[in-house]
C-alpha cells in the first residue's frame, strides 16, 4: 500500500512504541512524473502554497512582477523557462524570510487577440469588422483571450510553479484599464503625450502603425527578403547639368511615384560622366560599382562637391505631383553615404523618416497616394488599387520601356537587379511592413531619454552586460514612442476632440469619475464601442453645434503591459499606500527580447510617471529554440507537446535542464530529450538514490547532528557548509545556472564519493554515518528546494515526517561546521583519484586489478599525507608516493593571449610571444609573466601543465599537479585482481538470491585447474568480503556459473 507520496510505509502509521524507520521508496527505478503528481495532489489538499505565504505575514515583502503572457494559445518551453525562474526566486526569497505574493497576470488586448479572432471568423479586411460591428468583434476577442486560461492553469500547476490564479489580474478588467488611462492623463498633464504626423513602421494588413521598439524585439522581425533594386536617372533641367541624369538607387520602386526631391552629401565629390549619348551624375566613389553600365573608365565631364549641386532642379520619374511647391530639387542630407547605391538618395517624404526630415526643412509637403490598406489611390491612376509590393513589377516595366506615366519625364532605368536584405515584417501577421506617414499619438521619450539612461544604472541586470549593452544602448537611442493603434480591442486613448475645426478643443480623461462628471454616466466598460458613445456638446462652441467625440484609436498593447505595476493594484484609486511603499518591484524576468518590449515600456512609463526605475533586479534570459533552430513560437508550431515531456521525464527534470543551461546567462538553447534526461542522471536520480540508500540500510531514523569525528563525515558536512554559502551568494544574485552547477558538483561529491566510500559503515549500521547522511540530506533538500521542488519535498518529508520542505527556513550561516582546509585537501584527493582512474581506463587496466604504485606530484604534498591509504584503496594500488617535484614529471607550457594583451601592449606582444616560445617567460610571484620587454597580466596569458610521459601521466585540473601510474602487472597482482573479480560476482549472486547484506553464508567453489593456486592464495580475502563463514573448494550442488569458468553454490548459514 503506497501513501500519498509514493512510499511503501507511512511514518505516522508506525506504532508509537516501535523503532521509527524511514519510509522506504518503492522498488525499482523511481517514476518521477508519477511521484510529482502525488506531490501536486498533496500540496492541493494541504494548501501548502497559501501556508507558505501566510507564515510570512508581517515580514518584509519581496515584490515580484509577473509579466503577463498572451493566453491565446497553449504555453511552450519559452513560457516554461520564464515560469521556472518566476517560481525559483520567490520560493528562495520566502525561505529567506520574505513575504512574496505571486499574482498571475493575463495580457489580453491588442493585435494578437484580434488576429486570432480574424482567423477564427475568416476576416481578411478591417471593413468586415465594421460590417459585423465592433461590439460583436470585441466580444469575440474577449472570449478568445480567456479560452485557454484553464489550460494555462493546468500547465503552470504541472510545472510545480506556485502562483495565485484566484486573485489574478487581466488587462481587460475595468480597474486595470482605469489605471492605464490615468497614466495617459498624467503624461498629457506633464506635456509628455502629444499627437504628431510622423513616418512610422506601418502594417497594411492590420492597418495600423507600430512603434520602433516592436521592430527590435526579435531577430525574426527582420527575415531575409529579396526586393528589386533599381538605379534610375532623373533628368536635370536648367543650369550646367541640363539634360544630364541624376542617378539614384532604391529598393522600394513603389515609392518612386511619390518622389519629391533627391539628397546628396555636401562633402562628397560627385562627377558627371558620359556614357554613349547620355550623361549621368553620381558620387565619384561609386563609379567602379557601375563599370558594367558606364564603362571601366568613363569620360568625366565635370567634378562637383555635393554642396555645389544643392538647388539643382530635375524632372521626377513620374509626373503625378508636378505642381508640388518647392519640390524636385537637390537637397543636402547628412545621412547620405557612398557605401552602396549611387551616393544620391531619392526622397519620398511620406515613406521615409530621413526623407520627411529633409523635406520638412525645405518646405516640401509630403504626398500620400497609398491608402491604409497599402494600395495606391486615385492620385496615381496607373497603379490605382494595386498593393505597393504588387505594383513594383508594373512600375519597373514602365521605367524600362518608357511606357505609361514614365514616358512623360524621360527617366532612365540604368540597372535592375535583385537585392537580398533583412527587411522588417509585422511581428504578428508576418507581412512585410512599409514606412508611411500617419497621424499618431506619441510619448515624448526623447524629452526624458537621458533620465532613463541615468535610472538604468540603479537596476541590477543579469547577465550584467545587458545594462550598458543591449538595454543601455537602446535607451541611449530611444525615440518618441507611437502609442496609438487604429484598431478595436484595447484600452481606448482617453482623448475627446471637437468635430468642428472652427471650434477646436481637446479633453483628456484619467478616471471614471472624470468621465462621469462630464458625460453624466459612469462607464462600466471602457472598451469600444461603448466608450465611443460618450459624447457631449463642445463647451467652447457658442453656437452649440459642434460635439466632443473620442478619437477612435486604442493604446498600444505595450502601454497596457508597461502599466502593470500600478494597474494590477488599481493605483492610484486603491492601494495607494501599499504601492508607494513597494515600488519599484524587487524582481522581474523575461527573455532578452523584452529589452525592447516589456522591460523597455516599464522603464519608459516608470521614468515619466514616477522618476524611478520600475524594478530593481532583472533577469534577461536567452531564447529557447525549436527543433528547427528557430525561436519557439505558437505561430510556427515548432515544438513538441509540453505535456508529453512532463509525462515522460517530469517537471523537475525539465526545470533542471533549463535552469542549469547557459540560457540564463543570455545564451540560446535547443531543447533535446537527451539534455532533459541528463538532468535526471546528474542530480535527480543520485539525490533520490542517496535517500533510498539511507532508508534501506538505516535501522532507525537518524539524528540531526554535525559532531561526527570521522573524516569523511567531517568532509561532507564542511562541503555542505560551503554549498550553503555558495548557493546563498548565487541565489542572492539571481545566478540560478551557477547555483545549479554548485548543487551538481556537491551531489557528485555526496553520492559518488561520500556514500560510495562509506558503504561498509552503513552496512555495519555505523551511527555517525547514518546521522551524518540524515543531516546532509535534510539540509541539501532545503537548499535544493527552490530548484527541485518536487523531489526535495519527497525526500525531506521522508526524512523528517514534517509538513513541507517549502515551509522551512533557508539554512543559516554557521549552521554547519566549516573546515575549508579539509574540503580543499579532500577535493584534491578526489581529483587525484579521478585523474588516475582515467589513466587506468585509457590503458584498459580494469578497476579490480591491483597496480604497484601511484606517484602524486603536487605543490603541497603534506596536505594529502593523511589520505594516502584512502587513495590507495580507492585506486587499488599497493603504494602511494607524494612529492613536490612537479617538474620531474611535466612542464608548464605558457601561451600569450594576443587578443587580450594586444590592445595594451601593441607591438610588444609579438616580442612577448617570441620570448615565451623560446622558453624565456618567467611567472612572477604576483601572477604576472615577464616575457621579453613585456610584463603580462594574469588574464593576458595562460599556463598549462603538460606531462613528460603522457602514456601513464595525467595532469590535475588547473595545473595543480600530476599523477603518475605504475602500470606494471605482476603474476601476484594478476592473481589478486582475479580474486577481486570473483568477489564482485559473488556479491551480485548474494543480491540476486535475496540475501540480506548482513547474512552470513556457506560457499562451495569449483575452480579450473589453471586458477586453483590463485583461488587458494586468496581464499580468506574472498571469504571475508562476501561474509562466508564456511568456504570449501569442491564440486558444488546446483552450481551457478560466475566468471572465468568458476562455478559456485551458496547458502545462508
Swiss-Prot record:
Keywords of the record: Aminoacyl-tRNA synthetase, ATP-binding, Cytoplasm, Ligase, Metal-binding, Nucleotide-binding, Protein biosynthesis, Zinc
Pfam families: Anticodon_1, DUF5915, tRNA-synt_1
Localisation: Cytoplasm
One GO location term (cellular component): cytoplasm
Motif position, 'KMSKS' region: 631-635
Cofactor(s), by name: Zn(2+)
Record-linked InterPro entries: aa-tRNA-synth_I_CS, aa-tRNA-synth_Ia, Anticodon_Ile_ABEc, Ile-tRNA-ligase, Ile-tRNA-ligase_type2, M/V/L/I-tRNA-synth_anticd-bd, Rossmann-like_a/b/a_fold, tRNAsynth_Ia_anticodon-bd
Listed EC numbers: 6.1.1.5
Enzyme class: ligase
Gene Ontology BP terms: isoleucyl-tRNA aminoacylation
Motif window: 'HIGH' region: 69-79
Gene Ontology molecular-function annotations: aminoacyl-tRNA deacylase activity; ATP binding; isoleucine-tRNA ligase activity; tRNA binding; zinc ion binding
Keyword Endoplasmic reticulum: no
Binding-site positions, ATP: 634
Record's catalysed reaction(s): tRNA(Ile) + L-isoleucine + ATP = L-isoleucyl-tRNA(Ile) + AMP + diphosphate
Disordered, as annotated region: 1-30
NCBIfam families: ileS
Notes on the domains: IleRS has two distinct active sites: one for aminoacylation and one for editing. The misactivated valine is translocated from the active site to the editing site, which sterically excludes the correctly activated isoleucine. The single editing site contains two valyl binding pockets, one specific for each substrate (Val-AMP or Val-tRNA(Ile)).
Functional note: Catalyzes the attachment of isoleucine to tRNA(Ile). As IleRS can inadvertently accommodate and process structurally similar amino acids such as valine, to avoid such errors it has two additional distinct tRNA(Ile)-dependent editing activities. One activity is designated as 'pretransfer' editing and involves the hydrolysis of activated Val-AMP. The other activity is designated 'posttransfer' editing and involves deacylation of mischarged Val-tRNA(Ile).
Protein family (similarity comment): Belongs to the class-I aminoacyl-tRNA synthetase family. IleS type 2 subfamily.
The protein's assembly and partners: Monomer.
PANTHER family: ISOLEUCINE--TRNA LIGASE, CYTOPLASMIC, SOLEUCYL-TRNA SYNTHETASE
Listed name of the protein: Isoleucine--tRNA ligase
Lineage: Bacteria, Bacillati, Actinomycetota, Actinomycetes, Mycobacteriales
Gene name per UniProt: ileS
